Structures are given as C-alpha cells and as structure tokens.
Amino acid sequence: VTNERDGRDGGDRRDGRAQRDGRATRRGRPGYDKESLLRVAVKVFNERGYDGTSMDELSKRLGISKSAIYYHVAGKDELLQLAVDRALDGLFAASDEAAAVEGRAIDRLERLVRASVAVLVAEQPFVTLLLRVRGNTAVEKQALARRREFDRLVSGLVAEAEADGDIRPDIDPAITARLLFGLVNSLIEWYRPRRGGAGADEIADALCKVAFDGLRTRPAE
C-alpha cells in the first residue's frame, strides 16, 4: 500500500512510529483503543471498500489525528490484516471443533456448519470484510490462500461423508461444499441481530434442515 493511497504524510508516519516505539507499554489514549479503532475501520472498509478508504477518511470518522491512529497500528494494511485474521481464526477454530466430534464425517460436517454460523453471527462485520477481499494486496492474497485452505477442509469432509454413504454421490464434493457454505455465507447479506430475533442456534437449525435434508441419502424403498 503506497503512502498516496493511505493519504499518509511523512510527519504523521514518523510521529506514529515514534509513539509506538517509545511508548510500547503505554495503554491507548482515553476515548479509543486498538479494538474500537479496528471496529470503526472494518465498518468503513465494508462501506467504502478497502481500496476506497484512506487514512484521512478513517481519521475523520474516528475524530482523531492520523498520528493518533499510527500510535496503534502501522497503517490501514495492518487493520485489514487484524480484521481478516479474526474472521479466519474463528472459522479454523470451528473446523478444529468439528474435527473433535466423534462419529461419522457427516456429523463433523454438520458441527462445522453450526460452528461457522456462530462465527458469522458473532463476527459479522469481520467475516463480511473477509468475503469481499479480492486479492489486490499482499494481505488480501494471504487471506484468500487461507480461505482456500478452509474450503479444502470442507470439501474433504463432504467427500468423506459421501464415501461413508451418508451424502448423495451424484454431486461433486467441491460443488456441495461451495453450495453448503454459500448458504452459510449468505448470512452477511441479510442477518441483522435484533432483540427477540433469531439467534445463532436457531439459524443453524434452519440452515442444517434445509441443507442436510437435501444432501442425505435416502433409504431404498
């Protein structure tokens, strides 16, 4: 990411670096911290696109100087890295949870879907940003590589469940995996948490009924 794209000037960069290096043990300034800065940045990235967001825009939205932002992070690329890592770490934790389930592959696959829904509900802005990256920067390329790794894990579980005879064999496992997680990922487009509304468990129940009722093999009549 170039300085021009960030809207960063040399003085702000030097001031921010000096603050980070010289005050490494100091806590964030009153009124905001790294977490609140990250959440605002993710909101703006989702609204304007990562490439369309400058450090000037982030400074304006936060109501603080750019040097104050550099006190916490090296630039907007670090904010993007933190954001997509949070989403991906959540999804890989979901896969670890699924791997620990004893029994058949289809049971592990359903656990993975349910745990992934919980991640999307809990970290919706971060997952939204992850699903919108296009590989224009090194951070985005790395995120896409991790997404492909996750996709392979899902496809592997689908293939295993098919080999067990629990999933219909007339659909390619890679296609099944994409369709299944297309349903999961669609949550970012329509789900909005609200009091009294459906929670992660209710959404996961509905999604699994729709998906797995169509995927499971039927006993021969």
Model-derived features with residue positions:
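Basic, helix-initiating cap at the start of DNA-binding domains
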Residues: V1-R48, G52-I64, D77-Q81
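Base-recognition residues in the alpha-helical recognition helix of bacterial helix-turn-helix
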Residues: N46, Y70-H72, L82, R86
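Short secondary-structure transition hinges
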Residues: E78, R111, V117-G156, A163-D166, ...
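Hydrophobic alpha-helical connector segments
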Residues: L82, A93-A122, P173, A177-L180
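Short hydrophobic/aromatic patch on the recognition helix
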Residues: G63-V73
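Amphipathic, non-transmembrane alpha-helical scaffold segments
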Residues: L38, L80, V84, L88, ...
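Amphipathic C-terminal alpha-helical segment
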Residues: V119-A122, L129-R132, G156, E160, ...
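Hydrophobic alpha-helical bundle segments that form small-molecule/ligand-binding pockets
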Residues: A100-G103, R148-T176, Y191-R194, L215-R218
